[in-house]
Amino acid sequence: MYNNRFKNFLILLISFLFVLPAFTQVKLLIPMESTQSDHLKAYGIAYRHLMNTKEVDWLLNYRGGSFMFGYSTTLEEECKTKGVSYELLDGTMTAQVYSDSKNEENNTDVVRLEKVAKIAVYVPPNALPWDDAVQMVLEYAEIPYDKLWDEEVLTDKLKGYDWLHLHHEDFTGQYGKFFASYGSAPWYLNQQKINEDMAAKLGYKKVSQLKLAVVKKLKEYIANGGFLFTMCSATDTYDIALAAQFTDICESIYDGDPADPQANSKLDFTECLAFENFTVDLNPLVYEYSNIDVTGQLLQMGQFNDNFSLVEFSAKYDPVPSMLTQCHTAVINGFLGQTTGFQKNLLKKNVTVMALKDGTDYVRYIHGNYGRGTFTFYGGHDPEDYQHAVGDPKTELKEFPHSPGYRLILNNVLFPAAKKKKLKT
């Protein structure tokens, strides 16, 4: 009887030892193809997993850019709670996924995400009559972030953050060039006062001088390894402010003295990150900064003809633009902003084009390197509100959990966590 019990114990022990390796190799896969139940919340799960000092494998171009995790009951329960589709993989299935992703014949690869990026959003303290797409999607995905503005930027508070977002900011000091339409509106006057007070507090005579100082500090942040992501008017006004630093493009309604009528001949493009050889619109009543933007051209096409296509990159040779363009669709519905897109011929040669309107030179999404960091510019205001106007209601992202336009934003949040690896030659 004793021997039988001992034999049974040995059988159970041996069985356990054989099963254990298979169990420890079980993975949880979050597929990101069109069948995913909530694409946006999937990014939040990946981000929080990284916050807990755990690694995530980003499977570039594999089933829509899927995420693979070491299995835990906690992770599985979180997927259920957040309404995110997932699959459980045993050891054999996991090996097959890695094999498929690493196959030289496939435009796929595995990128290991290791260290979560600490996020900040540049936003003024006053309430403005429009919403910020990045803040909305971060909150929907439940990704934590901090807010900061000019004073924090100029007092070196950025050093504690890996990734910074700028949205709908006018770095030229012209308050968005809203004067003609909203110059007497309470929100506009409040915006002007808050900016002028901040400029005076920090020792600047003009708001344009304050914003130029901020832009230069942001450029220093990128050079030191920061990741900058901008949308809407923060894309082109960033470089316009740098180009105009030796002249005056602001009329008296904005800064109390006239603009230099020869300002365009005095622009210096050497310090610009992304654009060159552009012309600034000096009319203070025209709701446009320069000829970089293509909003007018896209309006003429009409909403139903406005879409843009993602450029396909080699996952193995160009991992960064590949990460930034992961999506479950290659064509995305367009959406307007104060700055919607960029004229291709005005881009610097070192800028990578990641999306554009087919058959045109209207670019929507670009990326580049500066120093040890990177910048990404994404035209448009709200990916799920085609022509978001001042005072329009907030977009409810629970109605758009599969939004490809918002998904591009979240790609930018995750890619700084990628383990750097030597590129193949």
Give the positions of each predicted feature:
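Cleavable N-terminal signal peptides
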Residues: I11-L12, A22-F23
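Hydrophobic targeting/anchoring helices
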Residues: T24-D132, A141, G380, Q387, ...
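Helical hinge/lid and interdomain linker segments adjacent to catalytic or ligand-binding clefts
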Residues: K27-L28, E33-S37, F67-E77, A127-T235, ...
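Catalytic cores of eukaryotic secretory-pathway lumenal/extracellular enzymes that build
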Residues: Y188, G203-Y204, K211, A243-F246, ...
